[in-house]
């Protein structure tokens, strides 16, 4: 199965990119602040899991593998943040509001962006691809269940023995 193209089909300005995010991806994006052209979305009907890129790569591969064996798509929009070495998986907001889950994710260096959080999306005003870029561009309103991504994440950490990376030292 071919992956969708990772380019934005409309012009490359913040207003046209926002229009693409709103119309095609059902992401209520807006420009904030207007003079900088940064595109953000308030997580209302979406949530996100933000994790180290090495773990994100493993989760993405696991979700692709699951998708090949299942009729239900498992991969939704995924963002890379190259400067910070993080990946963001946009998901449905169906993760439980549970202290044990937050503790588990904290130990793995994973953040849960719950409804109400502000998420920055790739913008044509970003300088190169050093800030944010799409690894898996949304081409429709689909976002996987947070529980599906969480299951994949748990499978990957169990297989690899993943632990929180140290805050000091060089970043990949």
Identify what each model region corresponds to.
Residues 86-88:
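Beta-rich nucleic-acid/ligand-interaction surfaces
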Residues 50-52, 79, 90, 111-113, ...:
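Residues in well-ordered beta-strands of folded domains
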Residues 1-84, 93-95, 135, 139-172:
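Signature for HUH/AEP ssDNA processing cores
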Residues 113-144:
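A recognition module on extended beta-rich or small alphabeta surfaces enriched in W/G with H and D/E
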Residues 91-115:
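Helical (often loop-to-helix) elements that flank the catalytic cores of nucleotide-handling enzymes
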